[in-house]
Amino acid sequence: MNTQQLAKLRSIVPEMRRVRHIHFVGIGGAGMGGIAEVLANEGYQISGSDLAPNPVTQQLLNLGATIYFNHRPENVRDASVVVVSSAISADNPEIVAAHEARIPVIRRAEMLAELMRFRHGIAIAGTHGKTTTTAMVSSIYAEAGLDPTFVNGGLVKAAGVHARLGHGRYLIAEADESDASFLHLQPMVAIVTNIEADHMDTYQGDFENLKQTFINFLHNLPFYGRAVMCVDDPVIRELLPRVGRQTTTYGFSEDADVRVEDYQQIGPQGHFTLLRQDKEPMCVTLNAPGRHNALNAAAAVAVATEEGIDDEAILRALESFQGTGRRFDFLGEFPLEPVNGKSGTAMLVDDYGHHPTEVDATIKAARAGWPDKNLVMLFQPHRFTRTRDLYDDFANVLTQVDTLLMLEVYPAGEAPIPGADSRSLCRTIRGRGKIDPILVPDPAQVAEMLAPVLTGNDLILVQGAGNIGKIARSLAEIKLKPQTPEEEQHD
């Protein structure tokens, strides 16, 4: 950003008083890195620490940030404020050093709230669909020439980044309920896509507590703000009388203010009509598969319509929507002759979904768009607590694929829980008599164990939130072909 652009921005968004150097602990996370990127472009000195380099840290290095690939007390020296990821423990040496030096330590969402303070904030919350909906809203506002700032939890593929500093008055941000930190945000508009039991350790295992927290989040809206909520979701329908703010509903339901009608999917695209109050019907072509993405688009359209954005800009943005990283992310289609000697091809799709509802939506999108394909899923459960709490739901949804390969649970720092492991889950699924799951004990064996089950007309879904995304990219790089010891050594 040049001096003239920065001066224009400062006329809208004042500089944070006495803050020059901002240090991020856990800077390599998508949400943390996105905020750091916006602040770097605003002219602040940025430093941060993480355990290993990744594309997020590389992008920040390119912007002039200082990155430490360790956690040491001296890393916070001279920082005006320290921003901490929810994944970082209180005994982290940098956090301890910051407290000792009386440097303010704040959570990620508190810094996001500061970015939102002087802008027209649009926050997207909900158990599922936040990242994609945030990207859709951002794409529509950009297409309309409003030059928004956005901070997303996933890669916005059209922009090639998780976050971007715009010169307009809008800030569009994903709001994270996993640690209840979204309560720091005070947006003008809030979308809630759905509410399900997840991250229940944050809410003391009490679903009523989770529901009340969403209500509290919506009460952060000013009385002239607006809540945009999916009325198809039974929990949201239950909570509507308690919102106490102007509300627009959306969904397939007949009583939705913005209603999805006549949905059909052809390959990776959805086609449907949106019915809006006092507006002409909108015939949408959405470059994203699945009924769940039609709902995400309906939320984005509801917000854009309320803002007065032209229908043509909305339609252009949705038809050209490029999606987000690891959300039904098409990685290629590969011939099987070099893989297992069979004719034909296999499509490879990478998807972040790790809750049964998300996995179910991904499977349905795959079946609707490619009904004749042999559907093969490589699944990595994420967290032992989630596997335990949603065990039966996982067992039910995973039987919907034709072939299932399962990696060990990605612990995300949790200790193992007896009976909440992949071997037990495979045994339960096998006992239901629909499919015979294959346990993959070592990620290095994925290509070797995948090759024999491919038929030549396959769609492979690589599914999960752990390190399985790296496995998906590795499969794409080797074009699904199992590697010989010599090839592995060469790599």
Swiss-Prot record:
<keyword id="KW-0547">Nucleotide-binding</keyword>
<comment type="pathway">
    <text>Cell wall biogenesis; peptidoglycan biosynthesis.</text>
</comment>
<dbReference type="GO" id="GO:0008360">
    <property type="term" value="P:regulation of cell shape"/>
</dbReference>
<keyword id="KW-0963">Cytoplasm</keyword>
<dbReference type="InterPro" id="IPR004101">
    <property type="entry name" value="Mur_ligase_C"/>
</dbReference>
<dbReference type="GO" id="GO:0008763">
    <property type="term" value="F:UDP-N-acetylmuramate-L-alanine ligase activity"/>
</dbReference>
<dbReference type="InterPro" id="IPR013221">
    <property type="entry name" value="Mur_ligase_cen"/>
</dbReference>
<dbReference type="InterPro" id="IPR050061">
    <property type="entry name" value="MurCDEF_pg_biosynth"/>
</dbReference>
<dbReference type="Pfam" id="PF08245">
    <property type="entry name" value="Mur_ligase_M"/>
</dbReference>
<comment type="similarity">
    <text>Belongs to the MurCDEF family.</text>
</comment>
<feature type="binding site">
    <location>
        <begin position="126"/>
        <end position="132"/>
    </location>
    <ligand>
        <name>ATP</name>
    </ligand>
</feature>
<dbReference type="GO" id="GO:0005524">
    <property type="term" value="F:ATP binding"/>
</dbReference>
<dbReference type="InterPro" id="IPR005758">
    <property type="entry name" value="UDP-N-AcMur_Ala_ligase_MurC"/>
</dbReference>
<dbReference type="GO" id="GO:0005737">
    <property type="term" value="C:cytoplasm"/>
</dbReference>
<keyword id="KW-0133">Cell shape</keyword>
<keyword id="KW-0573">Peptidoglycan synthesis</keyword>
<keyword id="KW-0961">Cell wall biogenesis/degradation</keyword>
<dbReference type="Pfam" id="PF02875">
    <property type="entry name" value="Mur_ligase_C"/>
</dbReference>
<keyword id="KW-0067">ATP-binding</keyword>
<dbReference type="InterPro" id="IPR036565">
    <property type="entry name" value="Mur-like_cat_sf"/>
</dbReference>
<dbReference type="GO" id="GO:0009252">
    <property type="term" value="P:peptidoglycan biosynthetic process"/>
</dbReference>
<dbReference type="Pfam" id="PF01225">
    <property type="entry name" value="Mur_ligase"/>
</dbReference>
<dbReference type="InterPro" id="IPR000713">
    <property type="entry name" value="Mur_ligase_N"/>
</dbReference>
<keyword id="KW-0131">Cell cycle</keyword>
<keyword id="KW-0132">Cell division</keyword>
<dbReference type="InterPro" id="IPR036615">
    <property type="entry name" value="Mur_ligase_C_dom_sf"/>
</dbReference>
<dbReference type="GO" id="GO:0071555">
    <property type="term" value="P:cell wall organization"/>
</dbReference>
<comment type="function">
    <text>Cell wall formation.</text>
</comment>
<dbReference type="GO" id="GO:0051301">
    <property type="term" value="P:cell division"/>
</dbReference>
<protein>
    <recommendedName>
        <fullName>UDP-N-acetylmuramate--L-alanine ligase</fullName>
        <ecNumber>6.3.2.8</ecNumber>
    </recommendedName>
</protein>
<keyword id="KW-0436">Ligase</keyword>
